């Protein structure tokens, strides 16, 4: 037998293994075993690893994008876009050395005492008028708080003696005011002189003016009941529609209520502005429409009432519109988000319309004059100078569109005084008047444009030979005239009142007759949105012809606006009679029994005008205001020598000579 094999040698070990249980028993069961992540990863197939890497990369990308979105939201919530913050820092005034009894302050006191003797307050009784930076606890602006902090001890030292100042019926104690002393002078006393200049206590309303007041109250009843604080009333469905969400109708009607002497209604509207009008909203607004309606409405109401609340709101809103001017060409974008400061062109084009970019100058210039912030005026005047220097015009006539990137006219060869170009011509004249007739470039452009209209756009209809303004497209004339063009006779008459050639008045009279006939020849007595004129003798045709798509009426003001100017300049009472006829037609065919007035679809059907269920803000902001002024026996009520109306009928003062 063989001996049993020897056991194998023990394995060589050159280390010692030590196990520390730390009071726990060692467990080597499967439930306790763990493999390293790397070993697990290596055991996965290539496909599995690629899928996991893709998912991780996707999640990281989503997290990065979310962080950017969150940062933008915080930026919006901060209250100012970066561009606006930069602008505010640049214009923050330096605190002057305190002077208790300077000659300038004594002069302001003299002005106050003199104006109190002559001024009769009109408006809501017992209005508590606050300084610009103390509108309400919730509504105090950021720049007001900064100015408050900047005052510090200087204001406390200056207000050791309590002095009571009576200002337009309100009692203001200096230690309660938060603005700088020189700012009080600029924002309160100086504009108060202007307010007393453009507004004088009128005579009691006559019968026709009472008719306008009744119409306004009926419109306002519908707005109060069904659309209070919203943009526009839908009177038939008894609800509202929103455009900007900023109480557009209410702001547009503020100065109308003041002019009509509706104290209680004005007081209620002012309360809404003080407590509810907040511009820190993530909403896009159209630069042109919001400027002429909101900024213009606030500025004019400030001048009429002397209430600094409206100037504070106007300054805040103006700053929020400024990012629209940050384009390569300085031609502003059409839209701007007033909460984030993001400005842009419409989605379908990079163009702005010429009327939009050249019909905001009156408002921004006046805002600069009141606040001392030059950027407002500089931005809009740069646009005016740029348009002046451009080629592509035809004897003073301008195309309808301009590119915000290149700063050049687009769609050349098309000329109209209707939509997209109309108020360019209006604001040439009105800026010249506003500035005290010193800016000759504006006057030259206006006069040249009127000559261009005569040469290229004027024709006469058949059979009554009505003079009308048509359109020109690449050398081809179209006998089409928007109701918007009916602003022109009034603008021509205004120019004659301020010394322009007398033949402008002849054209104004002729065009006024045409605009009246655009109303008179319709079965409802109301003008269509667009009219076409018959240029050839036909026994069975009227002068004014209307296509089915153009026969609606939006309660527009242009005809009664021009009637107001023609009556002021000529004092011919037929213009008052024509306006009264139009008011009666509004009452008969557009009035909604429950409150409000509605635009209509068919001015040619007196039996079924078909309400469109919308009352535009300009009906109470412009149409009824111009009718009230037209019927006034007092030609000094908002005199054409002391104020100029913006294109939304908001009166602004003519600047006194320096």
Swiss-Prot record:
Bilayer-crossing regions: 51-71
Cofactors demanded by this protein: Ca(2+)
Principal place of residence: endoplasmic reticulum
GO cellular component: cytoplasmic vesicle; endoplasmic reticulum membrane; endoplasmic reticulum quality control compartment
UniProt KW keywords: Calcium, Disulfide bond, Endoplasmic reticulum, Glycosidase, Hydrolase, Membrane, Metal-binding, Phosphoprotein, Signal-anchor, Transmembrane, Transmembrane helix
Residues given in the record as Ca(2+) binding sites: 647
Family designation: Belongs to the glycosyl hydrolase 47 family.
Function: Involved in glycoprotein quality control targeting of misfolded glycoproteins for degradation. It primarily trims a single alpha-1,2-linked mannose residue from Man(9)GlcNAc(2) to produce Man(8)GlcNAc(2), but at high enzyme concentrations, as found in the ER quality control compartment (ERQC), it further trims the carbohydrates to Man(5-6)GlcNAc(2).
Protein name: Endoplasmic reticulum mannosyl-oligosaccharide 1,2-alpha-mannosidase
Source organism of this protein record: Mus musculus (Mouse)
Organismal lineage: Eukaryota, Metazoa, Chordata, Craniata, Vertebrata
């Amino acid at each position: 037998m063989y001996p049993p094999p020897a056991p194998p040698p023990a394995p060589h070990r050159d280390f010692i293994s030590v196990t520390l249980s730390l009071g726990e028993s060692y467990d080597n069961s499967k439930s306790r075993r763990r493999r390293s992540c790397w070993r697990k990863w290596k055991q996965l197939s290539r496909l599995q690893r690629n899928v996991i890497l893709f998912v991780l990369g996707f999640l990281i990308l989503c997290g990065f994008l979310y962080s950017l979105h969150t940062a933008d939201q915080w930026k919006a919530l901060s209250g100012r876009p970066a561009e606006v913050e930069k602008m505010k820092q640049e214009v923050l005034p330096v605190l002057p050395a305190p002077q208790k009894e300077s000659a300038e302050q004594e002069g302001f006191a003299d002005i106050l005492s003199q104006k109190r003797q002559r001024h009769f307050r009109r408006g809501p009784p017992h209005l508590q008028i606050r300084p610009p930076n103390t509108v309400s606890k919730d509504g105090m602006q950021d720049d007001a708080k900064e100015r408050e902090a900047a005052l510090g001890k200087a204001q406390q030292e200056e207000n050791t003696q309590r002095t009571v100042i009576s200002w337009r019926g309100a009692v203001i104690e200096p230690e309660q005011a938060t603005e700088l002393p020189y700012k009080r002078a600029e924002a309160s006393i100086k504009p108060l002189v202007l307010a007393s200049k453009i507004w004088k206590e009128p005579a009691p309303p006559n019968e026709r003016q009472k008719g306008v007041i009744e119409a306004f109250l009926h419109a306002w009843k519908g707005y109060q009941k069904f659309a209070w604080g919203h943009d526009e009333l839908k009177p038939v469905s008894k609800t509202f529609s929103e455009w900007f969400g900023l109480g557009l109708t209410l702001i547009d009607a503020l100065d109308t209520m003041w002019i009509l002497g509706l104290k209680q209604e004005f007081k209620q509207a002012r309360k809404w502005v003080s407590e509810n009008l907040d511009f820190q909203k993530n909403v896009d607004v159209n630069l042109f429409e919001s400027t002429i309606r909101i900024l213009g409405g606030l500025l004019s109401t400030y001048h009429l009432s002397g209430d600094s609340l409206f100037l504070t709101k106007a300054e805040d809103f103006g700053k929020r519109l400024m990012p629209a001017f940050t384009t390569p060409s300085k031609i502003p974008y059409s839209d701007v988000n007033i909460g984030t400061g993001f400005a842009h062109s419409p989605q379908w084009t990079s163009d702005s319309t010429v009327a939009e970019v050249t019909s905001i100058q009156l408002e921004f210039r006046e805002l600069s004059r009141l606040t001392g912030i030059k950027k407002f005026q500089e931005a809009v005047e740069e646009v005016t100078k740029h348009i002046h220097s451009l080629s592509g015009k035809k004897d003073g006539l301008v195309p309808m569109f301009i590119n915000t990137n290149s700063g050049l006219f687009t769609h050349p060869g098309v000329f109209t005084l209707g939509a997209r170009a109309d108020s360019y011509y209006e604001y040439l004249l009105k800026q010249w008047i506003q500035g005290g007739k010193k800016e000759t470039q504006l006057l030259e452009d206006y006069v040249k444009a009127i000559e261009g209209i005569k040469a290229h756009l004027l024709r006469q209809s058949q059979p009554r030979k009505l003079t009308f303004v048509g359109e020109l497209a690449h050398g081809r004339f179209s006998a089409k005239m928007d109701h918007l063009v009916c602003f022109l006779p009034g603008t021509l008459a205004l120019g004659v009142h301020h010394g322009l050639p007398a033949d402008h008045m002849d054209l104004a009279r002729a065009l006024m007759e045409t605009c009246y006939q655009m109303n008179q020849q319709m079965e409802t007595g109301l003008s269509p949105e667009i009219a076409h004129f018959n240029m050839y003798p036909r026994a069975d045709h009227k002068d004014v012809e209307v296509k089915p798509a153009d026969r609606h009426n939006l309660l527009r003001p242009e005809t009664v606006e021009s009637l107001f100017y023609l009556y002021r300049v000529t004092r011919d009472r037929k213009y008052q009679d024509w306006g009264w006829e139009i008011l009666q037609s509004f009452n008969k065919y557009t009035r909604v029994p429950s409150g409000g007035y509605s635009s209509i679809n068919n001015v040619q059907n007196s039996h079924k005008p078909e309400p469109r269920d919308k009352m535009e803000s300009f009906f109470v902001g412009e149409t009824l205001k111009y009718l009230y002024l037209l019927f006034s026996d007092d030609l000094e009520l908002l005199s054409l020598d002391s104020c100029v109306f913006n294109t939304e009928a908001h009166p602004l003062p003519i600047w006194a000579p320096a």
